[in-house]
Amino acid sequence: MDLTTVADDLIVLHEGTTVARYEHLQPATTYSFMGREITTLPRPAGELLSRVATVNDVHFGEVEAGRIDDHTEGPIQRTAAGEPPYPETMNRSAVREIAAIDPVAVIVKGDLSQDGQPQEWAAFEACYRPPFGEALHVVRGNHDAYQGQQGYEGDQWIELPGVAVALLDTVLPLHTTGSLTAEQLDWLDAHAAAADRPVIVMGHHQQWIAGGNNDHRSQDYFGLHPDASDALADVFARRPQLLAYTAGHTHRHRVRRMPCGAPSIEIGCVKDFPGTWAEYRVYEGGIIQVVHRISSREALAWSERCRHLYRDFGIDYESYALGALEDRCCTIPLR
């Protein structure tokens, strides 16, 4: 059984398509559920000012999960005949869950599509725009610009109750990797210097941070180029209003630290295992990140089929994608 979510008032466990959900709990309190001792997150001081939801790697138009280029190894999962496309199943279930928390904003951090085709973007818009309207804020990912498309390009500054979001366009059209220009970093620096509230920075590509397997600097790094990553970390070091950078792209949950101590966060994809979206609870004294596994029966049936994608390549996708609980559910303190 997976312990998937722990918030300040919520604990959720999953086993297959079975969900055990415990609500209305007390913060920083240990409970015994399903034979496990589980402690809820502490609640930051002050009032709850807003809730913000994010998704990434939603991939409308994708028809095969687990496919790597032209390889036949997998396992590769496809929707059965007569079933709706799995991006529709996963995203429509995510939208229903997100709408239930009444967020002040829904941020989409790229890879709306499989190949940036008009019908794929139209499917994304049909799913997300009607329920959220002007609260929906979108930036592109690499899959949206492989043919040089310009849809959803550009940086955005989004002011919300208790927090601002700096949504960065990290895409290099025609490329898988990402970067940030000096002009973008100056824009972020100027906005952070003038900000009258804490700021979360978001983008599609994850940051390069030295350590582990990342000590080799390369412009072929799968995420943000190392020089741009370092420059982003330098802005964070100068501007304590910047609390965290959160990205997608890797289809995993992970938290690392910049040299200044600010967290650099990756959030998993909507489209396959474990199939998640993230909630940010903004309090006067800090922010709680709560990752939710999409839990409709049809969504769980699909995401469970994807638990062992890439197994034939020796990849433990289950562990990689799910990450540690503290990577999914954590407190982001004020700096």
Which residues make up each language-model segment?
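Beta-strand-turn-beta hairpins that frame and shape the catalytic cleft
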Residues: 43-53, 61-67, 157-167, 194-200, ...
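Beta-strand-enriched, solvent-exposed domains that form extended recognition/catalytic surfaces
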Residues: 1-46
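His/acidic metal-ligating clusters that form di-metal
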Residues: 94-105, 175-263, 313-335
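N-terminal active-site segment of His-dependent metallophosphoesterases
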Residues: 27, 32-117
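A short C-terminal boundary segment appended to hydrolase-like catalytic domains
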Residues: 15, 284-335
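Active-site glycine-centered loops adjacent to acidic/histidine catalytic or metal-binding residues
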Residues: 57, 110-111, 141-142, 204, ...
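Acidic/histidine-rich helix-loop elements
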Residues: 56-89, 145-152, 173-180, 215-221, ...
